[in-house]
């Protein structure tokens, strides 16, 4: 009997994807370039139909036609290496799916190369981490629709489910799937940083104990902030260190890593003039965190504001922080979906924004209840320029802006850094400013570089001799 699908790359994510497929009734062939990971996976089996192969040719020959091969290998050169090894063994009509965090431009290059050989190629964004890979992730496939249809029965089967809906939908051509995952990760960066800043306010400004802060996050997770990241934050704050008995959060070094997808999101936005400021600021916050030694030295040298004895009403300010966090998250998601929309128009992808919001509701790291509202907004207004002007969010932001302004101002007056909350407020105020100060910038550009300018009262392009 032939296997219905093959998985190459048996690290944590690849092994769990293979087990997920096998648990859903698929006959799965698995292959890894080093046999130790293959052997480790086989030891985990509990009756699933999963067959190990130690030679790539045997692996390929075990697959039913058209062959479907799922790659879960490290992004970059390893993906190219695997594809080069596979090409001589595959036939026209076979399908390769890349489920790693590949850059969408690499995916487009590989798509073109394989298209010439008649081999289908899907760039498949996957979100959910190792648990999601096993139990059901959010899946974002991009490539030719007819190629997707060959793989869809398996992809929809292993995806997370929300009600009767699988968290998998055809995203668009070529690199659209990996692009969608890339921006998803940018939103994730911003969401995480905003939550960290809310935590900082509760702990440093209101000086609340960790258990109380955890309870606050648990309460927030019962309302409109309900999301995976809010849920795990409460759990993190309650976790004790086995070695010291102290809260684990207090013994974790405050230096944040990153794997590159957030940077890719920011770079793509910058290259195309898209103001994804909160996403980019969250990346810079990680970079600043990595300067631990410099920060430790600077705290003894750089002065902040004089400490003042303040008596902030706890319940009032907890609500301000909740409002600030919600508004910051809305602004971050608005930027991410604006980046989807503007890039979709730029590349001619026709991204299904309402469906993207729906598949983010389950399995993925940024799953949140208000994604239903985002989907409804794009369903009602498919050409919506920005989520900030969707009626539901317009009303919310009007009501919650006081909370965000209070929190940001308190941070400024006390010298506590809230980079993403501050940037969210600047973005909100900048987006609602009908006439900005960019006229002065354009005049400056024309003064020193003769870059010309447009006028508000007549058509055309103008230059002034400013020294006369």
Curated annotation (Swiss-Prot):
<dbReference type="GO" id="GO:0004616">
    <property type="term" value="F:phosphogluconate dehydrogenase (decarboxylating) activity"/>
</dbReference>
<feature type="binding site">
    <location>
        <begin position="73"/>
        <end position="75"/>
    </location>
    <ligand>
        <name>NAD(+)</name>
    </ligand>
</feature>
<feature type="active site" description="Proton acceptor">
    <location>
        <position position="181"/>
    </location>
</feature>
<comment type="similarity">
    <text>Belongs to the 6-phosphogluconate dehydrogenase family.</text>
</comment>
<keyword id="KW-0560">Oxidoreductase</keyword>
<dbReference type="InterPro" id="IPR008927">
    <property type="entry name" value="6-PGluconate_DH-like_C_sf"/>
</dbReference>
<feature type="binding site">
    <location>
        <begin position="9"/>
        <end position="14"/>
    </location>
    <ligand>
        <name>NAD(+)</name>
    </ligand>
</feature>
<feature type="binding site">
    <location>
        <position position="451"/>
    </location>
    <ligand>
        <name>substrate</name>
    </ligand>
</feature>
<dbReference type="InterPro" id="IPR013328">
    <property type="entry name" value="6PGD_dom2"/>
</dbReference>
<keyword id="KW-0520">NAD</keyword>
<protein>
    <recommendedName>
        <fullName>6-phosphogluconate dehydrogenase, NAD(+)-dependent, decarboxylating</fullName>
        <ecNumber>1.1.1.343</ecNumber>
    </recommendedName>
</protein>
<feature type="binding site" description="in other chain">
    <location>
        <begin position="127"/>
        <end position="129"/>
    </location>
    <ligand>
        <name>substrate</name>
    </ligand>
</feature>
<feature type="binding site">
    <location>
        <begin position="32"/>
        <end position="34"/>
    </location>
    <ligand>
        <name>NAD(+)</name>
    </ligand>
</feature>
<feature type="binding site">
    <location>
        <position position="101"/>
    </location>
    <ligand>
        <name>NAD(+)</name>
    </ligand>
</feature>
<comment type="function">
    <text>Catalyzes the oxidative decarboxylation of 6-phosphogluconate to ribulose 5-phosphate and CO(2), with concomitant reduction of NAD to NADH. Does not contribute to oxidative pentose phosphate (PP) pathway fluxes during growth on glucose. The functional role of GntZ remains obscure.</text>
</comment>
<feature type="binding site">
    <location>
        <position position="445"/>
    </location>
    <ligand>
        <name>substrate</name>
    </ligand>
</feature>
<feature type="binding site" description="in other chain">
    <location>
        <position position="259"/>
    </location>
    <ligand>
        <name>substrate</name>
    </ligand>
</feature>
<dbReference type="GO" id="GO:0019521">
    <property type="term" value="P:D-gluconate metabolic process"/>
</dbReference>
<feature type="active site" description="Proton donor">
    <location>
        <position position="188"/>
    </location>
</feature>
<dbReference type="InterPro" id="IPR006183">
    <property type="entry name" value="Pgluconate_DH"/>
</dbReference>
<dbReference type="InterPro" id="IPR006115">
    <property type="entry name" value="6PGDH_NADP-bd"/>
</dbReference>
<dbReference type="Pfam" id="PF00393">
    <property type="entry name" value="6PGD"/>
</dbReference>
<dbReference type="GO" id="GO:0009051">
    <property type="term" value="P:pentose-phosphate shunt, oxidative branch"/>
</dbReference>
<comment type="subunit">
    <text>Homodimer.</text>
</comment>
<dbReference type="GO" id="GO:0016054">
    <property type="term" value="P:organic acid catabolic process"/>
</dbReference>
<dbReference type="InterPro" id="IPR006184">
    <property type="entry name" value="6PGdom_BS"/>
</dbReference>
<dbReference type="InterPro" id="IPR006114">
    <property type="entry name" value="6PGDH_C"/>
</dbReference>
<dbReference type="InterPro" id="IPR036291">
    <property type="entry name" value="NAD(P)-bd_dom_sf"/>
</dbReference>
<feature type="binding site" description="in other chain">
    <location>
        <position position="286"/>
    </location>
    <ligand>
        <name>substrate</name>
    </ligand>
</feature>
<feature type="binding site" description="in other chain">
    <location>
        <position position="189"/>
    </location>
    <ligand>
        <name>substrate</name>
    </ligand>
</feature>
<dbReference type="Pfam" id="PF03446">
    <property type="entry name" value="NAD_binding_2"/>
</dbReference>
<feature type="binding site" description="in other chain">
    <location>
        <begin position="184"/>
        <end position="185"/>
    </location>
    <ligand>
        <name>substrate</name>
    </ligand>
</feature>
<dbReference type="InterPro" id="IPR006113">
    <property type="entry name" value="6PGDH_Gnd/GntZ"/>
</dbReference>
<feature type="binding site" description="in other chain">
    <location>
        <position position="101"/>
    </location>
    <ligand>
        <name>substrate</name>
    </ligand>
</feature>
<dbReference type="GO" id="GO:0005829">
    <property type="term" value="C:cytosol"/>
</dbReference>
<keyword id="KW-0311">Gluconate utilization</keyword>
<dbReference type="GO" id="GO:0050661">
    <property type="term" value="F:NADP binding"/>
</dbReference>
């Amino acid at each position: 009997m032939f296997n219905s699908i093959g998985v190459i790359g048996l690290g944590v994510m690849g092994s769990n994807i293979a087990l997920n497929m096998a648990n859903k009734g698929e006959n799965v062939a698995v292959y890894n370039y080093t046999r130790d990971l293959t052997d480790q996976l086989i030891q985990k089996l509990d009756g699933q139909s999963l067959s190990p192969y130690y030679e790539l040719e045997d692996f390929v020959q075990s697959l039913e036609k058209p062959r479907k091969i799922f790659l879960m290998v490290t992004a970059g050169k390893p993906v190219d290496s695997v594809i080069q090894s596979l090409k001589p063994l595959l036939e026209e009509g076979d399908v390769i799916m890349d489920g790693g965090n590949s850059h969408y431009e690499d995916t487009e290059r590989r798509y073109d190369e394989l298209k010439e050989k008649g081999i289908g190629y899907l760039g498949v964004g996957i979100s959910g981490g190792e648990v999601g890979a096993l139990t059901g992730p959010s899946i974002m496939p991009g490539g030719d629709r007819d190629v997707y249809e060959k793989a869809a029965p398996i992809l929809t089967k292993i995806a997370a489910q929300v009600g009767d809906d699988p968290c998998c939908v055809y995203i668009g051509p070529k690199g659209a799937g990996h692009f969608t995952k890339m921006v998803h990760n940018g939103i994730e960066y911003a969401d995480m940083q905003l939550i960290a800043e809310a935590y900082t306010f509760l702990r440093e400004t209101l000086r609340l104990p960790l258990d109380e802060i955890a309870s606050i996050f648990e309460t927030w997770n019962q309302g409109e902030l309900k999301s995976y990241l809010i849920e795990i934050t409460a759990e993190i704050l309650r976790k004790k260190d086995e070695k010291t008995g102290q809260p684990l959060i207090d013994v974790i070094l405050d230096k944040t890593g990153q794997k590159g997808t957030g940077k890719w999101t920011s770079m793509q936005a910058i290259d195309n003039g898209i103001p994804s400021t909160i996403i980019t600021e969250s990346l810079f916050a990680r970079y600043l965190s990595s300067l631990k030694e410099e920060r430790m030295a600077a705290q003894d040298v750089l002065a902040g504001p004089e400490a003042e004895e303040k008596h902030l009403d706890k319940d009032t300010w907890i609500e301000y922080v909740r409002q600030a966090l919600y508004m910051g998250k809305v602004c971050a998601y608005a930027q991410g979906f604006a980046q989807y929309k503007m890039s979709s128009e730029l590349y001619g992808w026709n991204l299904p924004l309402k469906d993207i919001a729906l598949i983010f509701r389950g399995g993925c790291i940024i799953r949140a209840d208000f994604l239903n509202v985002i989907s409804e907004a794009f369903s009602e207004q498919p050409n919506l320029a920005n989520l900030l002007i969707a009626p539901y969010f317009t009303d919310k932001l009007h009501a919650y802006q006081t909370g965000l302004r209070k929190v940001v101002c308190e941070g400024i007056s006390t010298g506590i850094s809230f980079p993403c909350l501050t940037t969210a407020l600047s973005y909100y105020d900048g987006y609602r400013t009908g006439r900005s100060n960019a006229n002065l910038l354009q005049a400056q550009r024309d003064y020193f570089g003769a870059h010309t300018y447009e006028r508000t009262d007549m058509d055309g392009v103008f230059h002034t001799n400013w020294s006369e």
